[in-house]
Amino acid sequence: KQTLFSLLMCVLAIAGCDTQKQAIVGYELALTRAKQTLDSLYLNYSVSGTCLLRENYPSNIGEYTATYLASEEQKNMPNLYSYLWPYSGTFSAVNALFATTGDKEYKSVLDNKVLVGLEEYFDTRRTPEAYASYINSAPQSDRFYDDNVWLGIDFTDTYMLTKEPKYLQKAQLIWNFIE
């Protein structure tokens, strides 16, 4: 009985070690894929001279129409840049990479690329201030609660990671819009 128990413990220990190794390999693979996806996104969707992204790839600005828009008028207007909803996904993605790795490179990408582009959507013409669905240099666009809620969560997450008050202040501005 004691030999069988010892053998069982050895098998469980070995199986547990293998599971841990697989988890580490799975984590590293997922992290590599996340980094490659972010790099590919900026390689293929970036708009030269800006921190903004295109709506689609390959970019066919004259032919592309966003079928998810509220009106036919908006749908038929070509846009040089993505709408807020797809753009804001970069904020969540870079936040997740920063939180996972602790690599300050992602903080730099966040501050010098993602948030710079995001500010192009920040609408100060209406109160309370909030993020609009399209960039401010275009005609005034809608502001959606759900888009802003997700951004508020991302700003809060960034604040929790960095303890820098500027992120919390932005989350509070968004909350004023949601309220």
Q: At which residue positions do the language-model features occur?
A:
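Intrinsic disorder/low-complexity segments enriched in polar/small residues
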Residues: 2-3, 21
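Sec-dependent N-terminal signal peptides
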Residues: 3-12
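Catalytic-loop motifs flanking and including active-site residues across diverse enzymes
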Residues: 6, 86-89, 147
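A generic secondary-structure signal for well-formed alpha-helical elements
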Residues: 11, 159-162, 178
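C-terminal motif of bacterial Sec signal peptides marking the signal peptidase cleavage site
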Residues: 14-16
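Low-complexity, Ser/Thr/Pro/Gly-enriched N-terminal "stalk/linker" regions
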Residues: 18-138, 165-179
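Residue-level signature for tetratricopeptide repeat
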Residues: 97, 154, 158-161
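Mobile, glycine-rich extracellular loop/lid and propeptide segments
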Residues: 142-155, 164-174
